[in-house]
Regions:
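A juxtamembrane structural motif centered on a specific transmembrane helix
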Residues: 1-4, 20-25, 368-439
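Interfacial transmembrane-helix termini
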Residues: 5, 23-41, 58-68, 78-99, ...
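Transmembrane alpha-helical segments and their membrane-water interfaces
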Residues: 48-59, 78-127, 159-177, 221-230, ...
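Interfacial loop-to-transmembrane-helix boundary motif in multi-pass membrane proteins
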Residues: 62-70, 88-97, 106-131, 146-148, ...
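Membrane-interfacial helix-loop-helix modules of multi-pass inner-membrane proteins that assemble, modify
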Residues: 116-119, 130-153, 179-183, 260-269, ...
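Hydrophobic, glycine- and aromatic-enriched re-entrant/interface helices and adjoining loop segments
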Residues: 143-145, 235-329
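Hydrophobic alpha-helical segments of polytopic membrane proteins
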Residues: 182, 186-205, 209-255
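Loop-to-helix entry and N-terminal half of a specific, functionally important transmembrane alpha helix
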Residues: 343-380, 386
Length: 439
């Protein structure tokens, strides 16, 4: 017990020191013009640390590792976003960070009981259908956004956690087979394939092909888990057909991709520096300009480029903070994903769920970072937690909550124990009241 308290205190101190060090670098090396703006930023960062840590003390759970790591990443992100174009407090990003923390707790509470999720999976299908309808009928001319006054929502971001929950399955569901022609498939796997086809078709219709690799990686991860579950009999015929189909789909996608995608695949960015290659050229120049330690917070020039705080945020961080800080920030996200290896899921459903979450984060991070560095064609995908965007931050927070649920799940017998304890407590309180009345 003492060791756990010591570990908790040490983690809190480390968290504060990290944020204080970054704020010190902003004050020393940054372009602090108005001290009041810097004080607002420092107050928001330290205040968010204190308030969230006090909230975590109010309830008990098996692990706080992911809570601390998420809080650390979000406040680092808030400092980054508040320095682009000058030192100021980015109130919009602060609100996004708070919503991300709230979404994390919601994801944890809603997905920790795998039996409840499995029994109510039909409501997840209904939610995905509603998101499809909202994208088709309510977004602005295939721009993927629903605009309400000064706020905008991207429904496709919320499909990711829903799709991962659809991909997760228990051993019972995988053993329930249906014979279709010469193949034996589980009903759950067949529904998964249908949902995946609808998602891919919708992304193609929305011209949001940058998100397709993320959904594709989640789907492939789910198929792999379904083929390799304990005592599974893997059909070589199904594996061969799946591989051939995958190759044919990739060839067709490469040859029949829309014109704007073809330009990104074949463009010479330096030959077309002020055209289709403008963003990537400026991103590469910014990374080279920043070097290892950066030019200082608020001293960069990439803030003038479109999507500097979302699609090419890695390059913007590299310019102002240096490749060292940008790499450490990404490494912190990777370590957060690796906590699953330290405290692995206790059941197969949560194992599949956490595998899907990890696959989604890794693919999305790879697309953003490699695209900013011109190692792959530019996709316009956000970098989890570090890019601006309320919808993306909420979806990422919910996914972290799913990771936390995998580490500290809630089983049916635990639910029954808690109900009995509450009943005993109510009975004890009622007995005390009756005694007081009698006396």
């Amino acid at each position: 017990m003492y060791k756990n308290k010591l570990s908790y205190s040490g983690t809190v101190i480390l968290l504060f020191l990290t944020h204080l060090t970054m704020l010190g670098l902003v004050f020393i090396r940054g372009s602090v013009v108005a001290p009041l703006d810097f004080l607002k930023l420092a107050g928001a960062v330290i205040g968010l640390d204190i308030i969230y840590l006090l909230i975590t003390l109010a309830y008990k759970q098996m692990t706080y590792t992911l809570d601390f790591m998420l809080l650390g990443i979000l406040n680092i992100s808030l400092i980054f976003q508040s320095c682009f174009g000058g030192i100021h407090l980015s109130v919009k990003h602060l609100i996004s960070c708070v919503m991300c923390l709230a979404a994390c707790e919601a994801g944890f509470l809603l997905t920790r009981n795998h039996e409840w999720i499995r029994k109510n999976k039909k409501y997840i299908y209904i939610l995905i259908l509603l998101l499809f309808i909202s994208i088709i009928f309510f977004t602005d001319n295939q721009k993927k956004w629903i605009t309400i006054g000064s706020f905008s929502i991207q429904p496709s971001e919320f499909i990711k956690p829903c799709f991962i929950l659809v991909c997760a399955a228990s051993i019972v569901e995988l053993h329930e087979k249906l014979k279709i022609g010469f193949f034996y498939l589980s009903k759950d796997s067949l529904i998964l394939c249908i949902v995946a086809l609808f998602i891919f078709a919708l992304q193609w219709w929305c011209h949001d092909l940058g998100s397709l690799p993320t959904f594709g990686m989640i789907f492939l991860c789910a198929l792999f888990c379904r083929f390799c579950y304990p005592k599974a009999k893997i059909s070589k015929r199904i594996v061969a057909i799946a591989c051939i189909a995958g190759i044919l789909i990739l060839i067709a996608a490469w040859n029949f991709a829309p014109e704007y995608v073809q330009k990104r695949l074949h463009v010479d960015i330096w030959a077309d520096r002020y055209g289709d290659g403008y963003q990537q050229c400026e991103a590469l120049i910014g990374i080279a300009k920043g070097g290892w330690l950066g030019v200082g917070a608020g001293n960069g020039s990439l803030y003038k480029i479109f999507a500097h705080d979302s699609d090419i945020v890695f390059a913007t961080i590299c310019e102002e903070w240096g490749l060292l800080y940008a790499s450490l920030s990404v490494l912190l996200i990777l370590i957060m994903l690796m906590t699953v290896l330290m405290n692995p899921p206790k059941n197969y459903y949560h194992a599949m769920m956490t595998a899907g979450v990890t696959a989604a984060f890794l693919m999305q991070m790879s697309l953003n970072i490699f695209g900013s560095c011109n190692l792959i064609p530019f996709t316009g995908v956000t970098l989890p937690f570090l890019s601006t965007g309320g919808s993306s931050m909420m979806a990422c927070g919910f996914l972290v909550g799913m990771l936390k649920a995998g580490q500290s799940p809630l089983f049916q017998h635990e639910v029954m124990k808690r109900k009995k304890q509450k009943q005993k407590q109510k009975a004890a309180k009622a007995a005390q009241k009756s005694r007081r009345v009698n006396t």
